[in-house]
């Protein structure tokens, strides 16, 4: 089962399987030698490709030379891929996060080769959106949260459908929220999504999150945001 865009893209070109390691304390503390023997050695590898700055194992002590030596003894071809540059700067996840933090979605999309997305499972919330006529799907967030904040026009990928909507990524200050939450309102949609996985594609930033004096003010602004989102997504 490959639920996320990154995982699906890993299998686009003639790849039958994709294995993902759970990066926990055990894996983090594993020596390079143990990683080679316990992980790579059990996968029947014939060809291995890594980035030219790739390090692995505890304290990043493992490198290309170590893998190449292991490969020569075990009939495994090990190849380094070159660094890809945009101008004089290296493509990197930190550069993408920096672009997103600055709301430069155009640059982020150019670096990613697509728009920024987040895939997650819909979890139960406090149902506030439903009480003000704007039901939302709340997504479970990783501990690291997301490198964005504010209100966005979005496309929601659910099963084989692409749905239009609006999302808020933030702490919901109007109701005294403290923890970051990603809430998504899907236009003209009333299916139960609890427990389902959806993918949110962030298309345009509408505004920053702000604290309103009361729920009526919040509701009024949300409806304005919805109209703006529809215009941006349909145009």
Locations of the language-model features?
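Phosphate/ribose-recognition catalytic cores of enzymes acting on nucleotide-derived substrates
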Residues: 125-235
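Short, well-structured secondary-structure segments
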Residues: 16-22
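Contiguous mid-protein beta-loop-alpha structural module that forms a pocket-lining wall or clamp
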Residues: 26-109
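Single conserved hydrophobic/aromatic residue that forms the stacking wall/gate
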Residues: 1-8, 12
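Residue-level signal for inorganic ion chemistry
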Residues: 9, 48, 108, 154, ...
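Short, structured coil segments at secondary-structure junctions
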Residues: 13-14, 74
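Glycine-rich, Lys/Arg-enriched anion-binding loops that position phosphate/diphosphate groups
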Residues: 71-170
């Amino acid at each position: 089962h490959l639920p996320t865009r990154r995982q699906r893209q890993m299998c686009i070109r003639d790849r039958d399987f994709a294995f993902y390691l759970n990066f926990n304390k055990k894996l983090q503390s594993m020596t390079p030698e143990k990683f080679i023997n316990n992980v790579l050695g059990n996968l029947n590898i014939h060809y291995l490709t890594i980035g030219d700055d790739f390090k692995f194992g505890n304290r990043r002590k493992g490198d290309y030379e170590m893998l190449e030596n292991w490969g020569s003894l075990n009939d495994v071809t090990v190849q380094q891929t070159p660094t890809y540059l945009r101008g004089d700067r290296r493509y990197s996840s930190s550069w993408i996060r920096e672009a997103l933090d600055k709301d430069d979605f155009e640059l982020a999309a150019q670096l990613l080769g697509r728009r920024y997305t987040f895939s997650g499972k819909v979890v139960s919330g406090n149902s506030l959106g439903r009480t003000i006529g704007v039901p939302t799907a709340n997504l479970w967030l990783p501990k690291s949260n997301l490198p964005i904040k504010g209100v966005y026009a979005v496309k929601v990928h659910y099963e084989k459908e692409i749905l239009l909507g609006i999302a808020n990524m933030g702490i919901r200050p109007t109701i005294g929220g403290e923890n970051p939450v990603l809430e998504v309102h899907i236009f003209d949609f009333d299916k139960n999504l609890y427990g389902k996985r959806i993918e949110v594609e962030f298309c345009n930033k509408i505004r920053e999150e702000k604290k309103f004096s009361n729920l009526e003010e919040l509701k009024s602004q949300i409806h304005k945001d919805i109209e703006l989102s529809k215009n941006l997504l349909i145009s």
